């Protein structure tokens, strides 16, 4: 395949074979075989460069099209607008990740949150639904004591999630209570029962460490300063 004339002119110029005048442009062939080999290599290099550039652009366009699909953008969305939307979406995902982390990773302070999230009065379902969340020092009997506490309050566990990191634990539960025995004021009963449970956890840690090593961990503990009631 013969090289394109524009390629010949460009590389002939680089190798000194281009003769230009005000009226015409010609390409001269060198009788030197080494010069001919050099020109062939230069033209081959140019073709390789063009092919590599074509593939690079195709790869970039493919990635941009994938981003358009992910962000539900139409095919005519320009690159600058698309990239701005990508940056905004990444920021939103980062914020969501931080919020999820705050909800699942145990904090350094003892916390209790009791929320009345639903009042079911449809048909035979006459229950009050509470969402319970608390952080405290972990101990072997904690889960058992928690179940006994809920049982004593005549509450049924609908959902439970526990995360333990570095000796601290966060528990999130959704519990249901029968309206015959409970009302909105039951938030106070549940809160006080959990407060007692957390205090037992702290005492257990102190005794378990003989008042020594556990004392350092208890320095992280604060009073129950995050009690939320609705």
UniProtKB/Swiss-Prot annotation:
SUPFAM superfamilies: ACT-like, HLH, helix-loop-helix DNA-binding domain. Residues 44-93 form the bHLH domain. GO terms for biological process: regulation of DNA-templated transcription. It holds the Pfam family HLH. Its main location: nucleus. One of its GO terms (cellular component) is nucleus. This is Putative transcription factor bHLH107. It comes from Arabidopsis thaliana (Mouse-ear cress).
């Amino acid at each position: 395949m013969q090289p394109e004339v524009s390629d010949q002119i460009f590389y002939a110029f680089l190798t000194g074979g281009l003769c230009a005048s005000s009226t015409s442009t010609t390409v001269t062939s060198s009788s030197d075989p080494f010069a001919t080999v050099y020109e062939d290599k230069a033209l081959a290099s140019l073709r390789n460069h063009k092919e590599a550039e074509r593939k690079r652009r195709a790869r970039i366009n493919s990635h941009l099209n994938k981003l358009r699909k992910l962000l539900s953008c139409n095919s005519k969305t320009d690159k600058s607008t698309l990239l701005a939307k990508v940056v905004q979406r990444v920021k939103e995902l980062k914020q969501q990740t931080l919020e999820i982390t705050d909800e699942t990773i145990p904090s350094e302070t003892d916390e209790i949150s009791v929320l009345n999230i639903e009042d079911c009065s449809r048909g035979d379902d006459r229950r009050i639904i509470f969402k319970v969340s608390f952080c405290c020092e972990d101990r072997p009997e904690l889960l058992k004591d928690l179940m006994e506490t809920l049982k004593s309050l005549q509450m049924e566990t609908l959902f439970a999630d526990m995360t333990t990191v570095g000796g601290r634990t966060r528990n999130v539960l959704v519990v249901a209570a029968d309206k015959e025995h409970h009302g909105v004021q039951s938030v106070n009963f549940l809160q006080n029962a959990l407060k007692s449970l957390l205090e037992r956890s702290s005492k257990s840690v102190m005794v378990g460490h003989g008042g020594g090593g556990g004392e350092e961990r208890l320095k992280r503990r604060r009073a129950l300063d995050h009690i939320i009631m609705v």
